Amino acid sequence: MAASGITSLPALPEDGGAAFPPGHFKDPKRLYCKNGGFFLRIHPDGRVDGVREKSDPHVKLQLQAEERGVVSIKGVCANRYLAMKEDGRLLASKCVTEECFFFERLESNNYNTYRSRKYSSWYVALKRTGQYKLGSKTGPGQKAILFLPMSAKS
């Protein structure tokens, strides 16, 4: 009989490993909205909307953890961060501000919601037309706030 024992594996570096920067989710994502079937799109000029073509380069997003349950969402091609302004508009900022952080929550229907950390009752949302929905017009239970993260590997 072979002797049994415990095999120990090498520990990962404290920074989370060298494969990707700490805090970054490994692969870029597309955020598919349940309302109208649009992918969240961040344009280089700062506009935010939805588009149905998953091949559009501006739907490739990098989600980065700021702290537990809080993320920033960066357009890979646009090199801008999703932000919610004080009037509820969505736009893309060149640099990270307090308006760029969102509470990410997995809902019971397996869709994610992204609620503004600064304006805590407002959500990222897309209308059935593909336009963003003002944060002040959003709330729990709306299809417009439900997003399914999908892989955006090339």
Curated annotation (Swiss-Prot):
CDD domains, A to Z: beta-trefoil_FGF2
PTM-bearing positions, type Phosphotyrosine: 81
GO (cellular component) term, any one: extracellular space
Keyword Nucleus found: yes
Annotated segments matching region Heparin-binding: 127-143
Annotated family: Belongs to the heparin-binding growth factors family.
Record's function text: Acts as a ligand for FGFR1, FGFR2, FGFR3 and FGFR4. Also acts as an integrin ligand which is required for FGF2 signaling. Binds to integrin ITGAV:ITGB3. Plays an important role in the regulation of cell survival, cell division, cell differentiation and cell migration. Functions as a potent mitogen in vitro. Can induce angiogenesis. Mediates phosphorylation of ERK1/2 and thereby promotes retinal lens fiber differentiation.
Covalent cross-link Glycyl lysine isopeptide (Lys-Gly) (interchain with G-Cter in SUMO1) as placed by the record, residue numbers: 94
Residues involved in heparin binding: 35
Subunit architecture: Monomer. Homodimer. Interacts with FGFR1, FGFR2, FGFR3 and FGFR4. Affinity between fibroblast growth factors (FGFs) and their receptors is increased by heparan sulfate glycosaminoglycans that function as coreceptors. Interacts with CSPG4, FGFBP1 and TEC. Found in a complex with FGFBP1, FGF1 and FGF2. Interacts with FGFBP3. Interacts with integrin ITGAV:ITGB3; the interaction is required for FGF2 signaling. Interacts with SNORC (via the extracellular domain). Interacts with glypican GPC3.
Propeptide residue span(s): 1-9
Feature type site, description Important for interaction with integrin: 127-128, 133
Pfam (any one): FGF
Subcellular location field: Secreted; Nucleus
Protein name: Fibroblast growth factor 2
GO molecular function, one term: identical protein binding
Signal peptide: none
PANTHER family: FIBROBLAST GROWTH FACTOR
The organism's place on the tree of life at top rank: Eukaryota
GO BP term, pick one: positive regulation of cell fate specification
Presence of the UniProt keyword DNA repair in the record: no
PTM per Swiss-Prot/TrEMBL: Phosphorylation at Tyr-81 regulates FGF2 unconventional secretion.
Keywords: Angiogenesis, Developmental protein, Differentiation, Growth factor, Heparin-binding, Isopeptide bond, Mitogen, Nucleus, Phosphoprotein, Secreted, Ubl conjugation
